[in-house]
C-alpha cells in the first residue's frame, strides 16, 4: 500500500511541471502615465496599435480616444480588430487610447451641482462636478500631443464615451 502512495505521489508531481510549460501571451496594448499640469494629477492611459501588415511600413492610423477606458478597453480593441479586418466593414484599423478614470463626475460634467439623481438637494451634500472644460483641455493640449509623439497617428481623432462620458462626448461635439 505504501508503494501505491509513493507511485501516486510521483505521478502527481509530474502533472505540475507539465502545466507550467511556457504559455504564449496575448498582447493588446501598453500602459502609460502622464502628469497633467492642467488637472494637477497623474493620469493613466493604455494604447493599442494595430499590427502592421507586410508592405505597410510607416502607415499612420486614426486614433480612437476611449473614455472609461479601464472598463471598455478590451472589448473596444476586439471590436475594432474584428470590424477592421472584415471585408464587409468600412471601419479602418485604428489606434485605441483608453483614458482611465480618476474622478468621473468632476471630469465629465460641465456644471457643478449638489443635486442627487432624483433632483433633491440635502443640506450636507457637497457640490460636485463641473470640470469638463479642464478635462477637455487635458485631452487636447496634453494627452493628444503625448499620444501623437508615441504612435503613428494620421490626424483623424474619435472620442467615445457613455453615461457621463457620453455627456462629455456630446458636449465636446456641440462645442
Regions found by a protein language model. Name each.
Residues 137-155:
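Conserved acidic catalytic loop of the alpha/beta-hydrolase fold
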Residues 1-24:
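Bacterial Sec-dependent N-terminal signal peptides
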Residues 160-165, 169:
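Gly/Ala-rich beta-loop-alpha elbow adjacent to hydrolase catalytic centers
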